[in-house]
Amino acid sequence: LCGWLQDTRNLGGIAFLQLRDITGVIQLTLLKKKLDADDYKKWTNINRESIVSVRGIVKENKEAPGGVEMLPDNLQILNEAETPLPLGVIDKIDSEIETRLNARYLDLRKSEIAANFKVRAAVSGAVHKHLRREKFLEVQTPKIIASATEGGTSLFEMKYFDKTAYLAQSPQLYKQMLMGGGLERVYEIGPAFRAEEHNTPRHLNEFISIDIEMSFADDDVVMGVMERLVDSAARAVAKETEALETLGIEPIELNLPLPRITYDEAIEMSNGKAEWGEDLSMEATREIAAQMNGFFFITKWPLSLKPFYIQPDDDPKYSRGFDFMYNEVEMTSGGQRVHDVNMLKERLKEQGLDPDGFNHYLDPFRYGMPPHAGWGLGLDRLSMIFAGAKNVRECVLFPRDRTRMTP
């Protein structure tokens, strides 16, 4: 066996060592009378978190972790760890998350931290599998763009040879161009960047976004895709029984179809915490969440609160846009898109944007753009929900926020 030596208890005539790898922990039992004195001394004085290789006899022991132990006859130190460790791996002392992120390579050795990423991997795998099952084609779109095309959100500016470029905040406009290209159903799981100065447990400046776009579909159809996908992810996570036990949580179960309330109903449910025509604050969504349970949709938002590419409703005061929520946490926004080029130009002007700066985006709309709809969902935030984490950074290997660029 090979792994990390996480702990040693030397009782004189007998010593218990704990060897750990990604599958778990096994007890190594050293009997002083059966070993060379130098070997016993050496093996019981190895620094914590050193890499060792061990060979011996495995036997049942109900008192040992996992119900088995090994009686080693050979132990080799492959790489001895320095001491002291920057971060304790098995210590019961809770370290601040910033301290843990600074030594993420040690933090990940903790079973409860590794469990977060087993949950995340289950979510990611289920998303790919589900969207392929629904006949979506995986695509990759550029992350370096020439202009701030969506408006609203601050972008990261960068030097691109002798020009100024930006990091993409989403693949939104490219997804729509692909609808004009006849691909009909596309999805992408990739990085997105937003230069927002949020400093909350839910926000990052670099995140992984799950995006879909679907031709000949409206907002209702893609909400159906969303709830089926999240249900598939929930079922995949439920199979990660060891990770869930380590985290001390129960799997989330969905009952489809998920509840849908309108924006007007949400305003009423906010008990005066929100006014019509305003975005919903965290205080308002908490009031609403207290009357809901788990995942739900908020539909028929005011058109003025949605991006230029969202289709107006039959009543032009409203839109065909929606938000997807988990209790008070906003998971995503989506909706039916404008597919008429003249309406799109008007929507751009209404939001103070110049249509002439959007020609690359508008061109496909001039030559046969189908009705279409879509959404974008953060993989990081979805993983946070399924792992029962309080901070999205717990489910991101090396998070990037307004203060962190390393490691």
Report each predicted region and the residues it spans.
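A generic secondary-structure signal for well-formed alpha-helical elements
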Residues: R9, V54, E60-K62, N79, ...
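Extended, domain-scale alpha-helical bundle/helix-rich regions
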Residues: A217-L229
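Alpha-helix capping and helix-loop boundary segments enriched in small/acidic/polar residues
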Residues: A165, H198-N199, A217, L254-P257, ...
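TRNA-recognition modules of translation machinery and tRNA-sensing kinases, especially anticodon-binding
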Residues: G181-P191, T200, L204, I208-D218, ...
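Class II aminoacyl-tRNA synthetase-like tRNA-binding/catalytic domains
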Residues: L1-S215
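Metal-assisted phosphate- and nucleotidyl-transfer catalytic regions
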Residues: T149-E150, R228-M325, E350-D363, Y367-G368
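Alpha-helix initiation and N-capping motif
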Residues: P84, D94, L101, Y105, ...
